[in-house]
């Protein structure tokens, strides 16, 4: 399979095929994933920086990130966003946005343009090892999953603060694995676990589904994007946190499946390997 790049040129057809055994296969892997290496957070990692200088630097970097992202999404990918008006229903509260995982670079910038406020995105600690962009991910809103018991506790406290006190948008990719240009929706490998943030904080969720379509530019194979926002879906006060997790996960999955029906162009082909007898 072709290598993913920030500025993706047209890819030869023979390089746009991926044979897989399981939906949890990784078409794109970092060196750490190739080595099956567990990556820990840096010692003394702060999920919410205490220093005002660091917070100011983060705001400025996010602004620059958003400006570049606006150009990248609108001009390079010709992306159109549908349904942003639905976010108005969540004014006065934080919310969680669940997205399909189909492009390692669009998936960084897209939610920032889709949301109506600053985003904080749950990421794997492995992403902190990515060349160049890895070290700055926390400055532009990356929230690495905790590895140790203390890190997990600190992460949960930070997420609750962002959602409840600061009323921000938490972004999650429940499919977990990036499948470039994939036009379907995978079952969520972790089930309803990532829906605990909305359930326990009683905040709504939205979905953001990226779809692919033929370019309007003559001779260009690389697709353009149309992005659909759906929701809100709310926790039910009559249900327990566990029941709400299951409810919200089902609603998010069904929403993303429905929105994925807008896809009209299969740029990459995914073929399941036949089982060996």
State each model region's role.
Residues 2-96, 106-110, 275-277:
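Membrane-anchoring hydrophobic helices of lipid-metabolizing enzymes
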Residues 81, 121, 142-144, 205, ...:
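Conserved beta-strand scaffold positions in the cores of enzyme catalytic domains, especially
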Residues 85, 101-103, 110, 176-177, ...:
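Short, flexible active-site-adjacent loop segments at beta-strand->alpha-helix junctions, enriched
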Residues 103, 151, 186-190:
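Short, glycine/acidic-rich beta->alpha junctions
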Residues 89-149:
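Catalytic core of membrane glycerolipid acyltransferases/transacylases, capturing the structured
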């Amino acid at each position: 399979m072709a290598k993913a790049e920030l500025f993706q040129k047209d890819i030869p057809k023979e390089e746009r095929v991926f044979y897989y055994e399981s939906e949890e296969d990784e078409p794109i892997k970092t060196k750490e994933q190739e080595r099956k290496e567990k990556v820990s957070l840096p010692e003394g990692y702060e999920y919410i920086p205490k220093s005002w200088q660091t917070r100011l630097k983060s705001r400025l970097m996010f602004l620059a990130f958003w400006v570049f992202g606006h150009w990248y999404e609108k001009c390079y990918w010709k992306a159109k966003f549908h349904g942003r008006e639905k976010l108005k229903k969540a004014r006065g509260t934080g919310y969680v946005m669940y997205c399909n995982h189909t492009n390692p670079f669009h998936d960084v910038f897209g939610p920032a343009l889709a949301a109506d406020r600053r985003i904080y995105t749950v990421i794997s600690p492995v992403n902190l090892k990515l060349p160049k962009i890895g070290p700055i991910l926390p400055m532009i809103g990356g929230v690495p999953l905790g590895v140790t018991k203390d890190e997990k506790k600190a992460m949960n406290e930070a997420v609750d603060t962002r959602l409840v006190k600061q009323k921000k948008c938490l972004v999650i990719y429940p499919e977990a694995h990036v499948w470039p240009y994939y036009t379907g929706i995978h079952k969520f490998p972790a089930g309803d676990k990532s829906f605990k943030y909305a359930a326990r904080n009683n905040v709504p969720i939205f979905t953001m589904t990226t779809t692919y379509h033929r370019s309007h530019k003559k001779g260009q194979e690389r697709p353009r994007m149309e992005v659909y926002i759906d929701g809100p879906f709310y926790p039910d006060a009559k249900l327990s946190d566990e029941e709400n997790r299951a409810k919200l996960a089902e609603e998010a999955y069904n929403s993303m499946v429905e929105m994925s029906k807008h896809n009209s162009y299969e740029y990459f082909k995914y073929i399941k390997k036949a089982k060996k007898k």
